[in-house]
Swiss-Prot record:
Subunit structure: Heterodimer of an alpha and a beta chain.
Disulfide topology: none
Signal peptide (UniProt feature, chain positions): none
Single Gene Ontology BP annotation: regulation of translation
Role played: This protein is one of the two subunits of integration host factor, a specific DNA-binding protein that functions in genetic recombination as well as in transcriptional and translational control.
PANTHER family: DNA-BINDING PROTEIN HU, INTEGRATION HOST FACTOR SUBUNIT ALPHA
Protein name in UniProt: Integration host factor subunit alpha
Family, similarity comment: Belongs to the bacterial histone-like protein family.
GO molecular function, one term: structural constituent of chromatin
Entry-linked Pfam families: Bac_DNA_binding
UniProt xrefs under HAMAP family: IHF_alpha
UniProt keyword terms in alphabetical order: DNA recombination, DNA-binding, Transcription, Transcription regulation, Translation regulation
GO CC field: cytosol
């Protein structure tokens, strides 16, 4: 199950004690800051969590899976996320405990 912005707001309300309006503003502002930084071409480093950055992908050949026809995939910029070591360790510990 995915964690939604609405669930984040609810958790801030329950665990931090912000009222729902403040919690929603906090979550919206956080994501606005991330978006603004990426739009400016900046890398985002969240200590203990991971890094977001823009990566330029060159044009490359692709193939239509139905017809087999070669089609070019145009150059584009994508957002990438690389998880930090602490996040990897916590996820590994959680996944390991479920197996």
């Amino acid at each position: 199950m995915a964690l939604t912005k609405a669930e984040m707001v609810e958790r801030l309300f329950d665990e931090v004690g912000l009222n729902k309006r403040e919690a929603k503003e906090f979550v919206d502002t956080f994501f606005d800051l991330l978006r603004d930084a990426l739009e400016q071409g900046r890398q985002i480093k969240l200590s203990g969590f991971g890094n977001f950055e823009l990566r330029c992908k060159n044009q490359r050949p692709g193939r239509n899976p139905k017809t087999g026809e070669e089609i070019p995939i145009s150059a584009r910029t994508v957002v990438t996320f690389r998880s930090g070591q602490k996040l990897k360790e916590r996820v590994d510990a959680y996944v390991g405990s479920r197996q």
